[in-house]
Curated annotation (Swiss-Prot):
Its EC number is 4.2.1.93. It comes from Pediculus humanus subsp. corporis (Body louse). This is ATP-dependent (S)-NAD(P)H-hydrate dehydratase. One of its GO terms (molecular function) is ATP-dependent NAD(P)H-hydrate dehydratase activity. InterPro entries: CARKD, Ribokinase-like. Keywords: ATP-binding, Lyase, NAD, NADP, Nucleotide-binding, Phosphoprotein. ATP binds at residues 188-192, 218-227. The lineage of its organism: Eukaryota, Metazoa, Ecdysozoa, Arthropoda, Hexapoda.
């Protein structure tokens, strides 16, 4: 088993596969994304969540993207409703079924303010939100929506997206941005910085506010889609955390453990795929390595 600093803690909330489980108990994930121009991003996020071990993944996309995403995989539940007239009502009916929601992959510039809907919906639900890619544009223009959201919010900016987001604040350090937005923030890079706003010198699992780093080495190949894979993996780990939390009293930090696990899996996928494909490695090659990556870090 590969060296993963927090493997023991992560394994505590990975659901064990038993004969008594029924479909949905290992996670129901939603992906908000997919437009006429971008169909790959929501697929990569969705299939990653599924391959990591979520039971059901729903993709809420625009009408033009629906048939394309469906053709990629028959295992995804694709709902092309984002550009329908009553999109808010239609999506709201699904929210209570989900354990985590990814907003942004391939969403494009279409002004679908799902975050506002989730904010209103939070009176009945504190659905965890993972916001990436085009979803971060919504955050930049609606910071108060994130600050006021009752449930967990995880932001996953790359270098350019982080500069754009942090420019809204006088202190541009990741820890301050996360604290100001009342969110978990993963500043992606060769070393991923994971913080929800308070820094401790040593990691302590009795605290829910920590800054840690994932130094797992991936590869030097920067193919498109890696961020989408990470978002999907985060969603599954967060869903497992929510399910674990609802059935157990042991408290572990969401920002540290679930996000760290997703970062480690994604980077290990990159490493394994690059070893096999080298410069020709693509995100699809990484998808094929999710199982091996997971088992090398956490066992079966």
């Amino acid at each position: 088993m590969s060296n993963c600093k927090y493997a023991g803690k992560i394994k505590e909330f990975i659901p064990k596969l038993t004969p008594t489980l029924h479909k949905g108990q290992c996670g129901r994930i939603g992906i908000i994304g997919g437009s006429a121009e971008y169909t790959g991003a929501p697929y990569f996020a969705a299939i990653s969540a599924l391959k990591l071990g979520a039971d059901l993944v729903y993709v809420f996309c625009c009408k033009e993207a629906g048939p394309v995403i469906k053709s990629y995989s028959p295992e995804l539940i694709v709902l092309p409703i984002l550009d329908s007239g009553n999109v808010t009502e239609k999506i709201e009916n699904w929210l209570t079924r989900l354990h985590a929601l990814v907003i942004g992959p391939g969403l494009g510039t279409k002004p679908v303010n799902i975050i506002r809907l989730c904010n209103e919906r939070s009176k009945l639900s504190v659905l965890p939100l993972i916001i990436d890619a085009d979803g971060l544009r919504i955050v930049n223009d609606n910071l108060d929506l994130i600050k006021k959201y009752h449930g967990p919010v995880i932001l996953t900016p790359n270098e350019v997206e982080f500069k754009r987001l942090s420019s809204k604040f006088s202190n541009t350090e990741a820890i301050n941005v996360a604290s100001s937005l009342n969110s978990v923030l993963i500043q992606k890079g060769s070393t991923d910085v994971i913080t929800n706003g308070i820094n401790f010198d040593e990691f302590d699992f009795t605290f829910d506010d920590v800054t840690i780093t994932c130094e797992t080495f991936g590869s030097n190949r920067r193919c498109g889609g890696q961020g989408d894979i990470l978002s999907g993996c985060i969603a599954t780990f967060v869903a497992w955390f929510e399910l674990f939390k609802s059935n157990n009293t042991f408290i572990i930090p969401l920002s540290s453990v679930s996000c760290y696990g997703a970062c480690a899996v994604t980077k290990t996928c990159s490493k394994l795929a690059f070893q096999k494909f080298g410069r020709s490695m693509t995100a699809s090659d990484m998808i094929g390595c999710i199982h091996q990556s997971f088992t090398s870090l956490f066992g079966s």
